[in-house]
Amino acid sequence: MWKLKIAEGDKNDPYLYSTNNFVGRQTWEFDPDYVGSPGELEEVEEARRQFGENRYKVKPCGDLLWRLQFLREKNFKQTIPQVKVGDDEAVTYEAATTTLRRAVHFFSALQASDGHWPAEIAGPLYFLPPLVMCLYITGHLDTVFPAEHRKEILRYIYCHQNEDGGWGFHIEGHSTMFCTTLSYICMRILGEGPDGGVNNACARGRKWILDHGSATAVPSWGKTWLSILGVYEWMGSNPMPPEFWILPSFLPMHPAKMWCYCRMVYMPMSYLYGKRFVGPITPLILQLREELYAQPYNEIKWGKVRHVCAKEDIYYPHPLIQDLLWDSLYVLTEPLLTRWPFNKLREKALQTTMKHVHYEDENSRYITIGCVEKVLCMLACWVEDPNGDYFKKHLARIPDYIWVGEDGMKMQSFGSQEWDTGFGIQALLASDLTHELGPTLMKGHDFIKKSQVKDNPSGDFKSMYRHISKGSWTFSDQDHGWQVSDCTAEGLKCCLIFSTMPEEIVGKKMEPELLYNSVNILLSLQSKNGGLAAWEPVTAQDWLELLNPTEFFADIVIEHEYVECTASAIQALVLFKKLYPGHRKKEIDNFITNAIRFLEDVQMPDGSWYGNWGVCFTYGSWFALGGLAAAGKTYDNCAAVRKAVNFLLESQLDDGGWGESYLSCPKKVYVPLEGNRSNLVHTGWALMGLIHSGQAERDPTPLHRAAKLLINSQMEDGDFPQQEITGVFMKNCMLHYATYRNIYPLWALAEYRRRVPLPSLGA
């Protein structure tokens, strides 16, 4: 059976190491010797069966395998009776308390031994196939993914095939050439024949590809991976010159000015392009060359398909100026750089590029910044030295990305351990049930303290285009190493709240110096407009977004300011100022003033805020209202709050909830869920946003209606049902945060019970 392991390394693996003894690490292992009881196996198979039956209705999985494991290991039984509130009944204090206690006890049972909450964070369907392709090329596929792994990877691909035969950019998306081609190749590498797979998956996928222009219409990232694999020619890709990494730093397009994820993708990509690396041409590769195209492979005019992209994949059409730039590099520059004496310059550029790759790998303990970058960096290390330690260290960290659910095996974006735990802890603290939660809170506090980044990147980090990280929290764990402003703000908030509580209940409070380091991170990331960047200070100009080389993302070339990061930081610094009023007071006051101005400036005409990391206007509005309320802005003294309240009240549905489609994110306008369905996570966000605004004092009726929906939606064991996907990044790609369905209904009910006057049965 599959088992989730927590905070485990391998003492016998010289290529695996950690900065804090693997706190937060979560890895899946298949134990062939543990067969489990018939009841355990039945639970798992039933979860798989139900997902398969409902996969077109609810596309994100319930993340049930590890939940079943944890609840079984802890002998969890929900002993608090369930409550329902009738249509003509008022929500009482007792009903809210009972529902909250049931949710709190269930959620506490899901806590891992090191104090964090594990969870799937996946959904994009281009994450896993490149890893399979990389392992196939390097000859490590069978050792990294033996039979049971392959079985689960194929299950995942089958589960998320669309009814038209293709695969979406993410699990809820329409079919795209990029992910259909990658999924088809992945199935073939894993042993399926051209017409194999469940429900003729391969034949249906290949038909979709050929019906939509064949693999020549794959977008740029697809062209790169297909070229690497040997089923496409590098001549059909736009240039990615590694000389970019030796440009003078004063140039506006210097890598130091790029968004870190963009920089980290094109760093190893440019190395592989500069080498024109192609994997071994095996019989399977020759077959794929025949299967993926509508014409013979050797008759394709590769130079003419560089700019070709299927219409289904285009979110960001390239402007003419960008195509002219690539054409100039393709026609003029590349022929020179591959010939003497200019090839000496290319050799230097390749060496510099790999120097940066190794630096980033070492400073993330070979996790790297994310899954797309992980696979590219790993392959670049193998191309440089197939038997080298760099590649072996990469292999040791593959398990950090693998996740198993009832829908199969997938690749995480990377872990969300700190992110989910920070919000989960705040939800539990808001419940005012501390006396029932002591061990849970103490473990959570311990995890957060141990996960703070204690050092900056190594050496002369500024010359490697890195920002300070000392005092930050990452999205996942300490080993990951990459500072994030909102993760830092949420971690800081937790530690500040814990510092006001009895140590015998929640453990020793964090040293002030460590808190000061966190404040320093937040202050360092504010832009002139008052907004907060996520990873690094904004240093580049917006016009550089014209050079966005992808077709399916927006706003990826440079760092930007974000509503959520700004609002989180306001809340953290307001609380910090109360507890440490003498530390950098003037800077913090200025920060808050400018941050409020930013939130007011970027509010949408309808009163909402665009959410960059969640769906979408509901999410952004919850954050913004929380930030404004923390800074003393109210319905009475702030027009932005009044407009936001009107937006939320107008978008409330007949059943009392809120439900927003993921389509709001790419379209940048509010789109309700099909059929005006409610989503419990969205309902939690909206309910908390209204509570922040003081809605209870004006008219609590909308709050009671929302709370009634949450109470009546709770399941028998205290869980809440999995519904639509709720996370997003770069405007157009969705992320499944599997614990959101627990955290936000729980948190919203906690705030409701705490801050909204309710009738009591006793009265």
Curated annotation (Swiss-Prot):
CDD domains: SQCY_1
Residue stretches spanning the membrane: none
Keywords carried by this UniProt record: Isomerase, Isoprene biosynthesis, Repeat
A Pfam family it matches: SQHop_cyclase_N
Site (described: Transition state stabilizer): W419, F475, W613
InterPro entries assigned to the protein according to its UniProt record, in alphabetical order: SQ_cyclase_C, SQ_cyclase_N, Squalene_cyclase, Terpene_synthase_CS, Terpenoid_cyclase/PrenylTrfase
GO biological process, one term: triterpenoid biosynthetic process
EC code: 5.4.99.39
Domain of life of the native organism: Eukaryota
GO MF term list: beta-amyrin synthase activity
Gene3D superfamilies: 1.50.10.20
Catalytic activity annotation: (S)-2,3-epoxysqualene = beta-amyrin
Pathway(s): Secondary metabolite biosynthesis; terpenoid biosynthesis
Keyword Cell membrane carried by entry: no
Residues at the catalytic site: D486
Function: Component of the oleanane-type triterpene saponins biosynthetic pathway. Oxidosqualene cyclase converting oxidosqualene into beta-amyrin, generating five rings and eight asymmetric centers in a single transformation.
Family: Belongs to the terpene cyclase/mutase family.
NCBIfam families: squalene_cyclas
Name of the protein: Beta-amyrin synthase 1
